[in-house]
Amino acid sequence: TQHIYSAYLGYLVRLNKFGIKAGVRAEGTSLKASFARKPDLNFSTDYFDVVPNATLTYQMDMSSQIRLGYNMRIQRPGIWFLNPYINDVNPQNISQGNPNLDSEKSNNVNLNFSKFTQKFSINASLSYTFVNNAIERYTTTADFPSTDPRSQYNGALWNTYDNIGKKQQVGIFLYGNWSPTTWFRI
């Protein structure tokens, strides 16, 4: 079973041509997994994430605006990533989930310019997204202490997940629209 609880607080203020919008979401997740045939694999995981966002807007004139924004998104690991069951169908290539995974946190900063008139509109933006704790699958050679029940798999390939990934993405977006007449748009 999975239960998600959240609360959001936001604030908006306008000062002449400037607008500032800031918010924060607190999110708690409680996950409990039970296995009827293997109760020793039962586990529970709790997450608590604080997810901020902020936007600064400058209204250049009635039809033009510049906006700078930041937001965070979270991606909770799915049950397959968390499941501690050892899949040993192929005894030389073992898979096991990791119930200790954290939520993946994606941070995005974007700068946007937009202009709208009756004849045309243009929207240009530059964005940068980074993740410092991405959930990634990795493979190693099993090498457990002899006291660990998993030591029977020593020497086999061991596949599992951890928050070890780092991702970066840059995006440039340009949208335009031109309406030379009321019935024709490009």
Segments from the language model and where they lie:
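Outer membrane beta-barrel strand-and-loop segments of large Gram-negative receptors
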Residues: 1, 102, 117, 121-185
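Surface-exposed extracellular loop regions of Gram-negative outer-membrane beta-barrel proteins
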Residues: 3-40, 47-53, 57, 62-108, 128-155, 159, 178, ...
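A generic beta-sheet turn/junction motif
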Residues: 13-17, 72, 115-119
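Active-site-proximal structural scaffolding
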Residues: 2-4, 47-50, 72, 94, ...
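Transmembrane beta-barrel strands of outer-membrane/channel proteins
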Residues: 22-28, 66-72, 115, 124-130, ...
